[in-house]
């Protein structure tokens, strides 16, 4: 009950932290989509790149999040931004790459060869086939990678509070330092709820964007 009272009494503060957390995750995952999807397309077209690119992305994901945030501090200190949003978003961006690149590669690489041949047969260029045939067919799997990245990094971004990124992780950090169980429980609940709601919303968006013929 104390936790519920705390959340009700601090609803505005919690809402502000939630929107900040959401914005940070959206920024990091958005950058990963902009870079990761084209990178997935590239390694499908140039297959010799697949092993080193996917291997590097996998290696990044094996680094503990607190260690990766720690690595960002001296790197970004060189440009005067050792703590704060920039190193946090960069670290979460790196974590987001693997599921997006891997799912894009898997989805496009597993398409029936006949689809590409049919596109060539009617005179479509590579980019036309990609835009009108391959990406729509691969969209459900690609979107699955995006959903994985978002849900995973809602939790990772909470840890970024230790380097001054803000967001819901502040509740956990302040709860630990102040031995305030209400803040700890409130932070954990808000992070879990945010992950569940975003996963559901992205699933609905995935259904809407997926062509009717392959739902």
Where do the protein language model's features map onto the residues?
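Short cytosolic juxtamembrane segments of multi-pass membrane proteins
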Residues: 206-215
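Transmembrane alpha-helix signature in integral membrane proteins
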Residues: 14-42
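Hydrophobic alpha-helical transmembrane segments of polytopic membrane proteins
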Residues: 168-204
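Transmembrane alpha-helices
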Residues: 127-159, 186, 191
């Amino acid at each position: 009950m104390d936790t519920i009272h705390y959340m009700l009494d601090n609803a505005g503060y919690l809402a502000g932290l939630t929107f900040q957390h959401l914005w940070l995750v959206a920024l990091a995952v958005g950058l990963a989509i902009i870079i990761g999807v084209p990178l997935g397309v590239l390694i499908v077209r140039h297959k010799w790149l697949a092993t080193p690119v996917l291997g590097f992305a996998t290696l990044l994901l094996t680094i503990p999040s607190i260690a990766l945030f720690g690595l960002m501090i001296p790197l970004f200190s060189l440009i005067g931004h050792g703590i704060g949003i920039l190193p946090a978003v960069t670290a979460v961006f790196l974590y987001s790459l693997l599921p997006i690149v891997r799912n894009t590669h898997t989805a496009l690489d597993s398409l029936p060869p006949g689809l590409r041949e049919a596109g060539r047969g009617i005179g479509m260029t590579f980019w036309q086939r990609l835009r009108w045939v391959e990406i729509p067919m691969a969209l459900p799997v690609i979107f699955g990678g995006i959903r994985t990245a978002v849900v995973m990094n809602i939790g990772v971004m909470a840890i970024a509070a230790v380097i001054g990124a803000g967001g819901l992780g502040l509740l956990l950090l302040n709860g630990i330092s102040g031995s305030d169980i209400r803040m700890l429980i409130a932070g954990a609940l808000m992070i879990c709820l945010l992950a569940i709601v975003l996963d559901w919303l992205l699933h609905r968006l995935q259904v809407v964007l997926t062509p009717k013929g392959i739902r």
